[in-house]
Amino acid sequence: MSTASAFSSIQGCWFKGERKIRVADKRAKRLTLGSHVASPSSMSFRVSASSSVKPEKDIRIGLLGASGYTGAEIVRLLANHPHFQVTLMTADRKAGQSMESVFPHLRAQKLPTLVSVKDADFSTVDAVFCCLPHGTTQEIIKELPTALKIVDLSADFRLRNIAEYEEWYGQPHKAVELQKEVVYGLTEILREDIKKARLVANPGCYPTTIQLPLVPLLKANLIKHENIIIDAKSGVSGAGRGAKEANLYSEIAEGISSYGVTRHRHVPEIEQGLSDVAQSKVTVSFTPHLMPMIRGMQSTIYVEMAPGVRTEDLHQQLKTSYEDEEFVKVLDEGVVPRTHNVRGSNYCHMSVFPDRIPGRAIIISVIDNLVKGASGQALQNLNIMLGYPETTGLLHQPLFP
């Protein structure tokens, strides 16, 4: 099923009063509380015995791009997963090194030696997390065995419109034939389609904070499709681990800076998802800002309510829509979400406030950009794809202070 039809199918299976109650899923949740890459044409996809780890769990996991922040975060989360074990890790520039030499905080885990993609043997894994930068993922995924379940954390498969991808990302798409089978991985919204997917495009961090609150409100026709303004802020880890002058401590500390003004690459992804559920074109004004903090993301969203709708109605719709969801928490009226309260976790906190301008409302949504905004949601999706309760390995409480 395409993402467009998947979003349309929300009408019959997601919101209370209209959705089919997923008894098994609800029970499962309760029971679980416990770079530069080598060209595929040169790839032989092999790995030496010294680079592998004998699996001790049910599912063997391959991790592409393990030396970045999202790769390291997946390894951290999998440490407490009872069924998934990392048996293959690639990092072209770090090939031959141990993971603990790249990320000393992972020293206690039994992990394979890093290898280059061209030396990886994907017959030794059952599923793959792809944490490579956009533009490097397409050709690699195209060459992987079709039996593998894949969650791609890059932007390469998020946009259905190939021309739109090429316009916003400034490069040709090299795996167009795969796009038709991709399922967009906004877990709480497209869970049923994710269950049947082979290849999931994990959402971007900003689109996650924005779509989670807006999708139920647009679906219920409580807000207008026009004049949506989004002021978003992210910690520096969202820019990746690569050395950049703009991300040096002396450049970031004690200041705030806007970036991607009018042309941030997450805009078409946001508009695609909102337009799908609204069944008409939705446009947004979106400006992100870089904050002097490591983790965390907040989206402050200004919306115009439909005639006769009150902020209490928006709040109640969100409460009803997410009452059975483990990882989305709608706070009590008047309680302001804080990034500190979701740090290191897969939770999203949100709330609604009245604007002083009549007819408008303010929605605040916060996540940890590396967890719910990336690696945590990716693990949530793979759990679903492989038939495990989606909370497995993810019930870490937020870090505080």
From Swiss-Prot:
<dbReference type="GO" id="GO:0006526">
    <property type="term" value="P:L-arginine biosynthetic process"/>
</dbReference>
<keyword id="KW-0560">Oxidoreductase</keyword>
<protein>
    <recommendedName>
        <fullName>Probable N-acetyl-gamma-glutamyl-phosphate reductase, chloroplastic</fullName>
        <ecNumber>1.2.1.38</ecNumber>
    </recommendedName>
</protein>
<dbReference type="InterPro" id="IPR023013">
    <property type="entry name" value="AGPR_AS"/>
</dbReference>
<dbReference type="GO" id="GO:0070401">
    <property type="term" value="F:NADP+ binding"/>
</dbReference>
<dbReference type="Pfam" id="PF01118">
    <property type="entry name" value="Semialdhyde_dh"/>
</dbReference>
<dbReference type="GO" id="GO:0009507">
    <property type="term" value="C:chloroplast"/>
</dbReference>
<keyword id="KW-0028">Amino-acid biosynthesis</keyword>
<comment type="pathway">
    <text>Amino-acid biosynthesis; L-arginine biosynthesis; N(2)-acetyl-L-ornithine from L-glutamate: step 3/4.</text>
</comment>
<dbReference type="GO" id="GO:0005730">
    <property type="term" value="C:nucleolus"/>
</dbReference>
<feature type="transit peptide" description="Chloroplast">
    <location>
        <begin position="1"/>
        <end position="48"/>
    </location>
</feature>
<comment type="subunit">
    <text>Homotetramer.</text>
</comment>
<dbReference type="InterPro" id="IPR050085">
    <property type="entry name" value="NAGSA_dehydrogenase"/>
</dbReference>
<dbReference type="GO" id="GO:0009570">
    <property type="term" value="C:chloroplast stroma"/>
</dbReference>
<dbReference type="InterPro" id="IPR000706">
    <property type="entry name" value="AGPR_type-1"/>
</dbReference>
<keyword id="KW-0055">Arginine biosynthesis</keyword>
<dbReference type="Pfam" id="PF22698">
    <property type="entry name" value="Semialdhyde_dhC_1"/>
</dbReference>
<feature type="active site">
    <location>
        <position position="205"/>
    </location>
</feature>
<dbReference type="InterPro" id="IPR036291">
    <property type="entry name" value="NAD(P)-bd_dom_sf"/>
</dbReference>
<keyword id="KW-0934">Plastid</keyword>
<comment type="similarity">
    <text>Belongs to the NAGSA dehydrogenase family. Type 1 subfamily.</text>
</comment>
<dbReference type="GO" id="GO:0005507">
    <property type="term" value="F:copper ion binding"/>
</dbReference>
<dbReference type="GO" id="GO:0003942">
    <property type="term" value="F:N-acetyl-gamma-glutamyl-phosphate reductase activity"/>
</dbReference>
<dbReference type="GO" id="GO:0051287">
    <property type="term" value="F:NAD binding"/>
</dbReference>
<keyword id="KW-0150">Chloroplast</keyword>
<keyword id="KW-0521">NADP</keyword>
<keyword id="KW-0809">Transit peptide</keyword>
<dbReference type="InterPro" id="IPR000534">
    <property type="entry name" value="Semialdehyde_DH_NAD-bd"/>
</dbReference>
